[in-house]
Amino acid sequence: MSEVNFKKHRVFRETQDVIFYDISVEDSNAADLVVHEGAATSPPDDAVGAKQFYIHYHQTDHNRVLSGERTFELVNPEWRYPYHIVHLNRGSGALVIPPKTYHRSVSPEDGSIVINQAIRDDEFDASTEFIPVSAATCEELYRILTTEKPVIHTL
């Protein structure tokens, strides 16, 4: 059983060469457009080359690929299988990233565009929710990355 979830889209109309999608996310109160114009990693590795991750405490992400492909690494110490690698494309639906989940994303050479239809609670503060955490300085994160076999999701 996986802790990784997706919010699927609904096709509500198709015409020649055009598809209309309902990509609504119930209770979403923020939308972030994240563009990787080429090969990119977010957040980037730190100064010593260690992986860095974001972790939100007051936001649930719903990351949906609009163009290209994106790979997410998810680490959540509370999950039975705490390390996941998720490959996304436009047909995957929105990857749900709950609070207290370390996450980072990687785009290939062609780049990618993702919309994050987030749900933010009243305590959300952008100045504290987007501070990268390095595996070099977070013992728990380092331990999981070096000892747990990742669950690979390819959709």
Feature annotation, model-predicted:
Residues 1-90, 107-113, 118-155:
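Active-site region of the double-stranded beta-helix
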Residues 92-95, 99-105:
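Histidine-centered metal-chelating micro-motifs
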